[in-house]
Amino acid sequence: MTTVSAIGALVALIVAIFLILKKVSPAYGMLVGALVGGLIGGADLSQTVSLMIGGAQGITTAVMRILAAGVLAGVLIESGAANSITETITNKLGETRALLALALATMILTAVGVFVDVAVITVSPIALALSRRSDLSKAAILLAMIGGGKAGNIMSPNPNAIAAADTFHLPLTSVMMAGIIPALFGLILTYFLAKRLINKGSKVTDKEVIVLETQNLPSFLTALVAPLVAILLLALRPLFDIKVDPLIALPLGGLIGAFCMGKLRNINSYAINGLSKMTPVAIMLLGTGALAGIIANSGLKEVLIQGLEHSGLPSYILAPISGVLMSLATASTTAGTAVASNVFSSTLLELGVSSLAGAAMIHAGATVFDHMPHGSFFHATGGSVNMDIKERLKLIPYESAVGLMMTIVSTLIFGVFKF
């Protein structure tokens, strides 16, 4: 197998980051980065292309499952189920606990299979109304939603968890369950940090408040059917050794959910909408796979391992560090998890780190910098509350603190105590 130098792998990452910052499509940015890095790293054109194709092939099963998950996502978003869940939670907790309600609503939406940026956009109209009534700053409500979304993301059947489960050959539910305790710590920190920001930054004006149509929303219980069915089907493998692949479980959950809401006749339009949400992620992951193909077959792994050995740090630290670094490079939980898992999974297993521990720590680590400005999440979330770039940038340390908290807790559980 052709090996690329560590310098070549670093060049691949730098070129990819530079192009993404220049608003080039992330998929193209990573493809070009992989090509340039491979050539500079000592491989010829044919060898570089072979490494890129090999890396992309390694991620095709995850891509198939992500496309299938579009049915569940489409049903949740288009049927009004996501709005129903949000309305119920915020109404139950009331205005006095508005920040907790927003964090919890976004966490639950993300945990049941809604993309984290879509979850924030879904909750934002309610957040703006609560902010106006309770005199909360935009920074406080946005941090509450983002922190809740990050917490939900590491225990969800979303593309990031699918990528980690596929690479480490684990049941999807195992990766989801591994994120529950770190997510709860992340939620608690989010609430306390958001409370500190109540009077900092700009406030919501009357004209920014959006009135939602709530008359035709499904009930809270029927809204939960789709994700619950999907999770129960996935849970059959660890509980009873009955394997129902996410390729089947996620769309089937969406179908049954649509039936229970009395909206089965709309399933095709829901599926098409969900597919449109998943397609950019699937395409990006193919670019991610190509980049991972170069990095995985480079000397960069050895450089990182030697650095760990010289520092005296334990070998399991490679998992969260790789997740953190790749999320910084890609500004995406999904891409960060996919690259780190594909590049470092075999090394972690050789170092004695279990599959679940490696997947859990990489997954948590990938939430630390997934909100950086060269990714779409930064701009989509800021736009959801009409926040300007300067004010949005000030939230980055708080978002990173939430991701870091979840990473530390995950590392303690799976690295230090080896549960």
Curated annotation (Swiss-Prot):
<feature type="transmembrane region" description="Helical">
    <location>
        <begin position="101"/>
        <end position="121"/>
    </location>
</feature>
<protein>
    <recommendedName>
        <fullName>Uncharacterized transporter HI_0092</fullName>
    </recommendedName>
</protein>
<keyword id="KW-0472">Membrane</keyword>
<dbReference type="Pfam" id="PF02447">
    <property type="entry name" value="GntP_permease"/>
</dbReference>
<dbReference type="GO" id="GO:0015128">
    <property type="term" value="F:gluconate transmembrane transporter activity"/>
</dbReference>
<keyword id="KW-1133">Transmembrane helix</keyword>
<feature type="transmembrane region" description="Helical">
    <location>
        <begin position="24"/>
        <end position="44"/>
    </location>
</feature>
<feature type="transmembrane region" description="Helical">
    <location>
        <begin position="349"/>
        <end position="369"/>
    </location>
</feature>
<feature type="transmembrane region" description="Helical">
    <location>
        <begin position="216"/>
        <end position="236"/>
    </location>
</feature>
<feature type="transmembrane region" description="Helical">
    <location>
        <begin position="174"/>
        <end position="194"/>
    </location>
</feature>
<feature type="transmembrane region" description="Helical">
    <location>
        <begin position="311"/>
        <end position="331"/>
    </location>
</feature>
<keyword id="KW-0812">Transmembrane</keyword>
<dbReference type="InterPro" id="IPR003474">
    <property type="entry name" value="Glcn_transporter"/>
</dbReference>
<feature type="transmembrane region" description="Helical">
    <location>
        <begin position="396"/>
        <end position="416"/>
    </location>
</feature>
<keyword id="KW-0813">Transport</keyword>
<feature type="transmembrane region" description="Helical">
    <location>
        <begin position="66"/>
        <end position="86"/>
    </location>
</feature>
<keyword id="KW-1003">Cell membrane</keyword>
<feature type="transmembrane region" description="Helical">
    <location>
        <begin position="280"/>
        <end position="300"/>
    </location>
</feature>
<feature type="transmembrane region" description="Helical">
    <location>
        <begin position="242"/>
        <end position="262"/>
    </location>
</feature>
<comment type="similarity">
    <text>Belongs to the CitM (TC 2.A.11) transporter family.</text>
</comment>
<dbReference type="GO" id="GO:0005886">
    <property type="term" value="C:plasma membrane"/>
</dbReference>
<feature type="transmembrane region" description="Helical">
    <location>
        <begin position="1"/>
        <end position="21"/>
    </location>
</feature>
